[in-house]
């Protein structure tokens, strides 16, 4: 049977399309090219995250300057350290870092914290001089850092003299390299004050002022020179000029407040005295408000407020402000010591014992609650902290002899604390026995304990034998008011 070939009457015969084939060839070749380019990194895949721009050291430097101007000194230090991670050989960054580290030490409370920060500042200045041995500003900042390290409440007298001598040498070298360096001239004046060369200090700072440069550091040093001469009103005027140039640096407000408090302490007129103390409180409150606006948790302004209230005899307000300071640094032993002194002055002798114990010996969690809240942690519904005590030093000796004096005064034959009081008195005697006031306190305490041993308990009022502590106006070391 023959079947005829089907004719394409109703459908098209399949046939090749030249254009379609050309399109597919081009598409395949383009795909191969794209894959190779992606593998080589010339073409980036879709939907990958956008790369984050790498910051330069200049951006961190600008951030550091801005943070310092804003009063955020710790943030400024962090920014400059980030800049140095990118450019560790930049001497100018080391200079700026050292200056801020030095100033920031004024906001720290404990001896150890100040000592550590000042050592870091000096290390930064040393690095600046190493990188730029012919740079005037590097030597000026190293002189500044060494002068602030020469703090007799932090180091012994021999080290103080060594630092002051080296600081003067650096200041002289800075001016030899550039006699137009106004900051070097100002820092030299500050060094001369600490060397008790007041006439030379005045000459140097007047030269710096006559150059007409509007520098915060120059007005600050001029105020410091005037403070050392007892010219507290003029010192306030110059601190205010420094504040006008750097309105967010809270340590300047603390200096003004301290000078007003000193004027109040020395005023014979009761109304004037009260007015001066209130002005002092206003400046400390400004510092606290600036910190609050900046989000800076600094106990310093509240401790300064407490000192002023203590000077005014308003011990309840003083204790409230010390407790506010403890909210920022609840493990700071120095603040416990200051709280103990306030309790002591308000004749809350029993309450002063746990606070002073935490300051000098350290204490467990339960004792820290007793010190802060006057009750157990459970009753206060608070969590206690373990506190590390502070070593005996010129800044902490008041806590030691006050603690021992209270223990002696509260001793009774049936509840005798004199054994512990003897131990503390012996420590103080070994280091500060040549101080007549301290020697008198020790002798009085030992007399009380001798009476207790003989069955003659003291009157509680004998505890008032202790003289003024850290709430006093003028430390022996510097002759300038304490903030």
Model-assigned labels for residue ranges:
Residues 53-86, 103-114, 187, 265-266:
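Alpha-helical segment of the N-proximal tetratricopeptide repeat
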Residues 58, 92, 137, 144, ...:
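Start-of-helix register in tetratricopeptide repeats
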Residues 82-85, 123-130, 169-176, 206-210, ...:
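Conserved structural position within tetratricopeptide repeats
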Residues 69, 103-104, 148-149, 194, ...:
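Register position in tetratricopeptide repeats
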Residues 65, 99, 103-106, 144, ...:
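Residue-level recognition of tetratricopeptide repeat
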Residues 88, 133, 179, 213, ...:
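Short coil turns that delineate tetratricopeptide repeat
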């Amino acid at each position: 049977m023959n079947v005829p070939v089907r004719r394409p009457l109703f459908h098209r015969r399949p046939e090749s399309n030249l254009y379609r084939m050309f399109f597919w060839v081009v598409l395949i070749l383009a795909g191969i090219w794209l894959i190779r380019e992606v593998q080589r990194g010339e073409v980036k895949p879709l939907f990958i995250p956008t790369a984050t721009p790498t910051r330069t050291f200049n951006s961190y430097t600008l951030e550091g300057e801005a943070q310092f101007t804003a009063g955020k000194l710790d943030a400024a230090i962090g920014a400059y350290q980030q800049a140095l991670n990118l450019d560790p050989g930049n001497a100018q960054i080391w200079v700026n870092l050292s200056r801020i580290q030095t100033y920031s030490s004024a906001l720290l409370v404990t001896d150890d914290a100040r000592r550590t920060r000042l050592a870091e500042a000096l290390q930064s200045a040393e690095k600046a001089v190493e990188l730029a041995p012919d740079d005037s500003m590097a030597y000026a900042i190293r002189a500044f850092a060494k002068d602030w390290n020469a703090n007799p409440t932090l180091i012994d007298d021999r080290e103080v003299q060594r630092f002051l001598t080296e600081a003067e040498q650096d200041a002289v070298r800075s001016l030899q390299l550039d006699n137009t360096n106004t900051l070097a001239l100002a820092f030299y004046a500050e060094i001369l004050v600490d060397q008790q060369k007041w006439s030379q200090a005045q000459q140097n700072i007047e030269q710096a002022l006559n150059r007409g440069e509007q520098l915060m550091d120059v007005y600050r040093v001029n105020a410091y020179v005037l403070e050392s001469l007892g010219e507290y009103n003029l010192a306030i005027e110059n601190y205010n000029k420094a504040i006008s140039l750097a309105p967010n640096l809270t340590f300047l407000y603390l200096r003004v407040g301290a000078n007003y408090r000193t004027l109040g302490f020395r005023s014979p007129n009761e109304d004037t005295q009260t007015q001066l103390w209130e002005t002092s409180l206003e400046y400390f409150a400004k510092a606290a408000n600036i910190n609050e606006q900046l989000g800076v948790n600094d106990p310093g302004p509240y401790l300064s407020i407490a000192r002023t209230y203590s000077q005014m005899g308003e011990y309840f307000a003083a204790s409230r402000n010390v407790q506010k300071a403890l909210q920022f640094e609840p493990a700071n032993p120095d603040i416990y010591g200051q709280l103990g002194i306030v309790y002591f002055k308000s004749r809350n002798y029993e309450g002063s014992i746990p606070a002073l114990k935490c300051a000098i010996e350290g204490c467990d969690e339960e004792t820290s609650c007793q010190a802060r809240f006057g009750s157990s942690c459970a009753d206060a519904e608070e969590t206690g902290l373990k506190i590390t005590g502070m070593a005996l030093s010129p800044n902490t000796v008041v806590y030691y002899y006050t603690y021992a004096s209270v223990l002696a005064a509260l001793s009774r034959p049936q509840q005798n604390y004199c054994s512990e009081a003897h131990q503390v008195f012996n420590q103080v005697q070994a280091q500060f026995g040549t101080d007549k006031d301290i020697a008198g306190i020790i002798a009085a305490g030992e007399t009380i304990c001798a009476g207790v041993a003989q069955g003659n308990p003291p009157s509680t009022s004998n505890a008032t034998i202790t003289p003024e502590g850290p709430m006093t106006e003028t430390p022996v070391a510097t002759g300038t008011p304490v903030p």
